[in-house]
Amino acid sequence: MINGEWHEFSPAGIARVPEEHGVYALYDGDTLIFYGRSEGRSSSTLRGMLLDHMLGTMGRRTRAVTTFRYEVADLPAIRQMELLEEYKRLNGRVPRCNERLS
């Protein structure tokens, strides 16, 4: 689980996110719906990825997002895999918007 501060899924909330790489969790109310990551291209920072979700360029599956959390990580792909494995162990499945990715 990503611990830390909850942020409103809004331009103001996203503006407080650093231009770094890491992982993020998107929520519909109090339900976790997606674990994502940012890495690779310099434009694919946490802030950039969250803005892409907000603008709809990541598809319609995360349109219901109301809040998010994030974590700066040196190895985002590995951290995302750890988060997905933990969620699946506890819930018997991955978050609903990660289903097509698993």
Question: Would you name each region that the model predicts?
Answer:
Residues 1-44, 71-85, 102:
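GIY-YIG nuclease catalytic motif and its immediate N-terminal context
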Residues 90-101:
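Coupling/hinge elements of helicase-like and P-loop NTPase modules
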Residues 19, 60-63:
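A generic structural signal for short, non-catalytic loop/turn and secondary-structure boundary residues
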